[in-house]
Amino acid sequence: MIPTSDITGLILAGGRGSRMGGVDKGLQVFNGAPMAMHALMRLSPQVGHVLINANRNLAAYESFGVPVVVDAVPDFAGPLAGILAGLEQCQTPYLLTAPCDSPFVPTDLAARLSTALAEAGARIAMPVTLEPDENGRPRRQVQPVFCLIDAALADDLTTYLQQGGRKIDAWTARHPSVEVVFDDAAAFANINTLAELRQLAERR
């Protein structure tokens, strides 16, 4: 397994929040705290350092007490732009990402992904969940925004984005990757609308 001190965590909070009406998703309150804070608190014990990627409300994110990195690619270019911002500031061999709108980040995410990456000799490790399809049969669902990445891939990601690439699954497919099955699909649930946020808060 890769030592905790060799991993930097990155909370991805740089999106437009368009499905939430343009609000900053990471700052929406869930169970008394911003969603990004929930993700941060669950990821922090698993890594040696933590960053937040954000493109607005920077002072609010800086108040969380960790460094904030801004996309170098303009116009809200998607999660890969945030990942590149993290890789450019990362001082460790590996970067572990999680989205700001997933308040139940698994507490064993780093351990399981790093073990699989080391054993497979891969450069990227991603979780996979099994979720029912329309017929109730289990369907594999890759969760690429939760990924452990070899920080040496920063230059390749820069090139991919400069060439107009934006799809995270297309970029990860360029590199040796390993997938790790997690049983708790709900731990990877992301909240896309204010209605979903209210519903989840009522259930918890």
UniProtKB/Swiss-Prot annotation:
Amino acids binding Mg(2+): D101
Short name of one Pfam family: NTP_transf_3
Cofactor(s) in the UniProt record: Mg(2+)
Domain of life: Bacteria
GO BP annotations, alphabetical order: bis(molybdopterin guanine dinucleotide)molybdenum biosynthetic process
Residues annotated as binding GTP: L12, A13, G14, K25, N53, D71, D101
EC numbers on record: 2.7.7.77
Enzyme class: transferase
GO molecular function: GTP binding; metal ion binding; molybdenum cofactor guanylyltransferase activity
Keyword terms: Cytoplasm, GTP-binding, Magnesium, Metal-binding, Molybdenum cofactor biosynthesis, Nucleotide-binding, Transferase
Reactions catalysed: Mo-molybdopterin + GTP + H(+) = Mo-molybdopterin guanine dinucleotide + diphosphate
Main location: cytoplasm
Record-linked InterPro entries: MobA-like_NTP_Trfase, Molybde_CF_guanTrfase, Nucleotide-diphossugar_trans
Keyword Nucleotide-binding: yes
GO CC annotation: cytoplasm
Subcellular localization: Cytoplasm
Functional summary from the UniProt entry: Transfers a GMP moiety from GTP to Mo-molybdopterin (Mo-MPT) cofactor (Moco or molybdenum cofactor) to form Mo-molybdopterin guanine dinucleotide (Mo-MGD) cofactor.
Assembly and interaction partners: Monomer.
Domain comment as written in the entry: The N-terminal domain determines nucleotide recognition and specific binding, while the C-terminal domain determines the specific binding to the target protein.
Protein family according to the UniProt entry: Belongs to the MobA family.
Protein name per UniProt: Molybdenum cofactor guanylyltransferase
Source organism per UniProt: Ralstonia nicotianae (strain ATCC BAA-1114 / GMI1000) (Ralstonia solanacearum)
Lineage: Bacteria, Pseudomonadati, Pseudomonadota, Betaproteobacteria, Burkholderiales
